[in-house]
Swiss-Prot record:
Component of the NOP7 complex, composed of erb1, nop7 and ytm1. The complex is held together by erb1, which interacts with nop7 via its N-terminal domain and with ytm1 via a high-affinity interaction between the seven-bladed beta-propeller domains of the 2 proteins. The NOP7 complex associates with the 66S pre-ribosome. Interacts (via UBL domain) with rbg-35/mdn1 (via VWFA/MIDAS domain). It comes from Neurospora crassa (strain ATCC 24698 / 74-OR23-1A / CBS 708.71 / DSM 1257 / FGSC 987). It is found in: Nucleus, Nucleolus; Nucleus, Nucleoplasm. This is Ribosome biogenesis protein ytm1. The lineage of its organism: Eukaryota, Fungi, Dikarya, Ascomycota, Pezizomycotina. SMART domains: WD40. The keyword Transcription does not apply. GO terms for biological process: chromosome organization; maturation of 5.8S rRNA from tricistronic rRNA transcript (SSU-rRNA, 5.8S rRNA, LSU-rRNA); maturation of LSU-rRNA from tricistronic rRNA transcript (SSU-rRNA, 5.8S rRNA, LSU-rRNA); protein-RNA complex remodeling; ribosomal large subunit biogenesis. One of its GO terms (molecular function) is ribonucleoprotein complex binding.
Length: 487
């Protein structure tokens, strides 16, 4: 077989893309190019006046599902292909490596992070009530407090302590419901809904978090919380193995059915008076005991809010019909599942479910397939548990993960390869395109043999403002990059 090693060799390529705004005319899609050309040269060809005639858009190129990392010549040699091979190149806008932007200091571990912006879910749910330019970051900490930050790293508001209506133990999860409402949950087994208001001039804003609703039903720590501001609904996953379904409406929320769960049930009268608050106390719309081990995450279907998905340390992924509080399907995986994200797909009615595992990888599951099916893809690269996941808000094919190995990793599902024999030999595998390390560990000597010890990532969220992560280093870290998010 001939190999393209001779000087001046050329290869015929066919350019394709799935991005409508950068489609080539059909007459321009096939071209002869030098065999030794690389990504940069191909990108220049596409941007040229005779092709797309664009302002230097950086492109990456996929060949058979994998990114082209060398020259076309090297690709042909590696795959035993001759010069006569017509190579189909799918071109996509490049992701630029995310750069470190800032860190916000805390007094204790940061367990959860969320963002309020014009493009975030809560920003959209707020409608006209959200003021553009007043982006906010929400953090939850093991010290039992919520904090609201402005984009400059100033704390605008802090939740009250446990004796004044706040959480009485570490907070594990928190989300914006809107620009004026927040939900949080944690180790005190409660979900708390807060009214958030701001006052003062733009250069000296002050925020107030006032507890308005306490939700009781779980009998153990609540480790995950998901919200839908449009329907005023909340999903929770608890170490008691159950999934909670709640409303933020006091009028439609049922009374607490088990009075022993209320804070005053085992407290002296003097203690009750000292900690009494005016927040209403309500129970769940449904409490579904569907897992045989701690439930670790639950999310709404991106398109159908009457459907939810949950994962657990019992190795299962469950599809839930929220109208009947029943399990529709169960998928059993090989490992304990610790995190979950639903990735919308324009070509399918159901999302792709990304499940972070205790085995250091991410399993992608299609909930439409049979209960006997295994994962459709595996994302490998982390060196410790994967405890947080977030989809890219701008496309369907990338996500970010947070791990106890002290990193966040960005994945592109268009870049895949067959699994090797050591990886089980079945399905497809993808590897991270970028790794975000903790800035707090730069220049520090490693003190422990445990990967990620002292800098575990507990939470990550992806917004057009950037990638925000919080963890064991007591910081919220912000990373930005063109293509990864808006500049």
């Amino acid at each position: 077989m001939d190999h393209p090693t001779e000087s001046g060799a050329q290869v015929r390529v066919t350019f394709t893309t799935q991005e409508e705004d950068i489609q080539l005319d059909e007459s321009k899609r096939q071209l002869l190019v030098p065999a030794d050309i690389r990504r940069y040269g191909l990108s220049r060809i596409l941007n040229s006046e005779s092709m797309l005639d664009t302002n230097s858009i950086p492109f990456d190129f996929l060949v058979n599902g994998s990114f082209l990392r060398g020259s076309l010549e090297e690709y042909l040699n590696a795959n035993g292909l001759s010069l006569e091979t017509n190579i189909t190149l799918q071109y996509v806008r490049s992701l630029i490596p995310p750069t470190y932007e800032a860190s916000f200091e805390h007094d204790d571990w940061v367990s959860a992070v969320d963002v309020l912006s014009a493009t975030s879910p809560a920003g959209r749910w707020s409608g006209d009530n959200f003021q553009r330019g007043q982006d906010r970051i929400l953090s939850a900490s093991y010290d039992g407090l919520l904090r609201i930050w402005d984009a400059s790293g100033n704390v605008i508001g802090t939740s009250p302590s446990g004796s004044h209506g706040g959480h009485t133990a570490s907070i594990k999860a928190a989300k914006f419901l809107s620009s004026t409402q927040i939900a949080s949950a944690g180790m005190d087994r409660t979900v708390r809904v807060w009214k958030y208001t701001e006052s003062g001039e733009s250069y000296e804003r002050r925020g107030e978090l006032k507890p308005t609703l306490e939700l009781y039903g779980h009998t153990s720590s609540i480790d995950s919380l998901e919200v839908d501001g449009a329907s005023k609904r909340i999903l929770t996953a608890s170490a008691d193995g159950s999934i909670g379904f709640w409303t933020t409406s006091k009028a439609s929320a049922p009374e607490v059915s088990d009075s022993s769960l209320l804070p005053g049930a085992h407290t002296s009268k003097r203690r009750k008076l000292a900690t009494s608050v005016t927040a209403a106390q309500r129970g769940p719309l449904a409490l579904m005991n569907i897992h045989n081990a701690p439930a670790t995450a639950a999310v709404f279907d991106p398109r159908d809010r009457t459907v939810a998905y949950s994962v657990s340390q019992d190795h299962t992924v469950k599809t839930i019909d929220l109208t009947t509080s029943s399990v529709v399907s169960t998928f059993t995986t090989s490992h304990a599942l610790l995190s979950l994200a639903a990735l919308p797909r324009s070509s399918a009615s159901a999302p792709l479910l990304a499940c972070g595992t205790s085995a250091r990888h991410i399993t992608l599951v299609d909930p439409r397939t049979s209960t006997a099916a295994t994962s459709v893809m595996t994302l490998r690269g982390h060196a410790n548990k994967v405890v947080s996941l977030a989809a890219n808000p701008e496309n369907e094919y990338s996500l970010v993960s947070g791990s106890h190995d002290g990193t966040c990793r960005i994945w592109d599902l268009r870049s895949v390869r067959p699994a090797t024999k050591d990886e089980g030999g079945m399905g497809s595998v993808s590897e991270p395109v970028y790794v975000i390390d903790r800035e707090s560990q730069q220049g520090k000597k490693k003190k422990s043999s445990v990967t990620g010890d002292g800098c575990k990532v507990f939470s990550v969220v992806w917004d057009q403002l950037g990638i925000f992560s919080g963890g064991e280093d007591k910081k919220v870290q912000i990373n930005k990059g063109r293509g990864v998010n808006a500049e």
